[in-house]
Amino acid sequence: LAPTDKSEEEILAWEMEGTRDEEIHRILTVIRPLLAETDSIPIIMGGDFNVHSHLDWTEATRNLYHHGGAVVNWPVSIAMEEAGFKDSFREMNSDPVASPGVTWLADADSLETECRMDRFDFIYYQGKTIQAIASECYDNSLGKTFTFKGEDFFYPSDHGFVLSKFELK
C-alpha cells in the first residue's frame, strides 16, 4: 500500500523498491511478439496486479480514498498504457470519483471515501478487432458469501474482481 503521507516522488521511490515494475516489463518483453499481431488477434490480460493505477490517482481523487493529496503516475499502469493496452474498466467508467471501481478495501465493511480502498485488479486489452462494451468492479471480502447472478459463493480472496464484456469485430 502506498505511504499516502508522502509526495508523489517519495511514493514512486517506495513503489520502485518492489518488483512490480520489473515484473510488468519482463511480461511485456515476453509477449512483445504477440503484441505485434493485435491488428488481427486481440489480447486480453487481466488479474490481481496488486498495484494502483495512474487513472485512479488523479487530480479529482487526490483528497479521497487516503490518497493524501497525491496525484501519482503509477509505473505499471503507465507501462501497460505505453504498450498499447486499454484499461477496460476505466474506459467504460471514465470518472474515478463517480466510479472508483473498488476491488480492495482496508476496511471491508466500509465504502466511505475516508476508508483505505483502491482498484488493484484489472482487465487490460488491445487489438483492432476487440472493443470493451461494459465493465463493472465487484468488491468483496475474504470468507464472505458472495451472490453473483443469483448464485451464492464462498469468496476465497481479499480482492474483489472486474467483469468486462467485449465485442469482437
Regions found by a protein language model. Give the residues of each.
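A solvent-exposed, charged loop/short amphipathic helix patch at secondary-structure junctions
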Residues: L1-G18, A60-G68
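Metal-dependent phosphoester-hydrolase catalytic domains
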Residues: P33-I44, N50-K169
